[in-house]
Every structure is written in C-alpha cells, then in structure tokens.
C-alpha cells in the first residue's frame, strides 16, 4: 500500500514534513513520503549520510531537546507534519509536547510509546486485555531471577525493561547462558523472563 494524496486527505497543507531520527527507518519513511505529489520538502534531523540522496530531502540540525529552538525552527520552516522515528523521544513525550503546541505529529504519545519502551508494562497490558502473549515473570533481584530460571525449562527469553537500543533481548540455549544474560543486564533495569 503506497502513500498517496488520499492518505493525507485530512491535511489542508502538506508542503513540508520533518522526520526526526537518523536511521534506516527514517530514510525509508522519507523515501515513501517524498513520493507523494503534495509533499514539497522533507527535512530530516539529524538524518544520516544517505538522507540527502533521497529526492526532496534535506538534512537540518535541530536540537530536539531544546524545546524553544525546536518550536522556532518548526515555525520558520512552516512544517506541516512531524514524524518521530526513534523510541527515546517518543518515550520522553515529544509527540505530546508538539501536539500541545498545535503541530500535527505522526507517532504515539508517551502513554502509547510505553508499549515499546517498557517490556513489563506491555506484557501486563497484554495479559490484562486478554491479548495472547507468552508467559512471563517480572523480577526485582538477581536471586529471584535465578530461582525462576532453575524452576523453568528452556527455551526462556530474558528481556531488560526499558529501551536498550535493540540489545536488551537474549534467547539463551541453556540455563547457564540464561543466568549469564540475566547477570549482564540486571544492573540496567528490571528483567523479565
């Protein structure tokens, strides 16, 4: 399914889009969005070396943590839609802040982003909403985790709660590896098995 003018029928203007992020996800979004005939310019901040190779795209520097500067730049660039790619600004409530400033934003608010940034909250949400999900335990100490590991059978999955840049999930082949994985991430946050 492509992005065409019908995809954006609720927008009175769609000249300038800002995409926040610097990864392949953001470049893919920029590539798809720039194909729409309504879009004149796609700004990426910070973008990456490949961003400017995409038609209609320009990398710009905006400190998204400096809210005053961000709002000023968005107004100056006459941005019609902001797309937030990375999880961290979503988890920190950037989409909520921008919506309160009357900007159109594609990306969940802080509460919606919690499904991504908190593994324990997401699992509890699925359980409470009767959404099928694997059995899980939430532990608060390494000793508690080891006890569950010893009483369980492999395969087990060990997950750090919170954002871990894609590095917080382990699928060990043995209980010993499971304990090592648990030890390696336990100081970062709560772990889930």
Put a short name on every predicted segment:
Residues 82, 191-193:
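Conserved small/polar residues in nucleotide/adenosyl-binding loops
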Residues 133-138, 156-185:
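Glycine-rich phosphate-binding loop of ATP-grasp-fold ATP-dependent ligases
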Residues 1-111:
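ATP-binding N-terminal substructure of ATP-dependent carboxylate-amine bond-forming enzymes
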Residues 99-109, 116, 122-129:
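Glycine/small-residue-rich loop that forms an oxyanion/phosphate-binding "nest" at active or ligand-binding sites
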Residues 59-65, 137-141, 172:
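Short acidic-hydrophobic, aromatic-tinged amphipathic segments that line or gate anion-handling sites
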Residues 84-91, 108-117, 137-145, 163-166:
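Short, glycine/charge-rich beta-strand/loop segments that flank catalytic centers
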Residues 35-38, 75, 103, 127-131, ...:
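Generic secondary-structure signature for well-ordered alpha-helical cores
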């Amino acid at each position: 399914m492509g992005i065409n003018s019908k995809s954006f029928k609720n927008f009175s203007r769609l000249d300038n889009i800002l995409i926040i992020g610097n990864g392949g996800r953001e470049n893919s979004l920029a590539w798809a969005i720039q194909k729409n005939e309504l879009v004149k310019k796609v700004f990426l901040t910070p973008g990456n070396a490949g961003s400017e190779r995409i038609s209609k795209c320009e990398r710009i520097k905006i400190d998204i943590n400096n809210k005053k500067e961000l709002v000023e730049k968005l107004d100056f660039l006459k941005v019609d839609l902001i797309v937030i790619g990375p999880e961290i600004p979503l988890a920190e409530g950037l989409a909520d802040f921008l919506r309160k400033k009357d900007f159109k934003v594609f990306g969940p608010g802080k509460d919606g982003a919690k499904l991504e940034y908190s593994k324990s909250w997401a699992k509890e949400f699925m359980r409470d909403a009767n959404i099928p999900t694997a059995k899980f335990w939430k532990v608060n100490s390494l000793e508690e985790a080891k006890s569950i590991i010893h009483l369980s059978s492999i395969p087990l999955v060990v997950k750090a709660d919170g954002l871990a840049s894609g590095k917080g999930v382990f699928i060990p082949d043995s209980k010993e590896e499971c304990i090592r994985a648990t030890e390696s991430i336990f100081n970062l946050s709560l772990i889930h098995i």
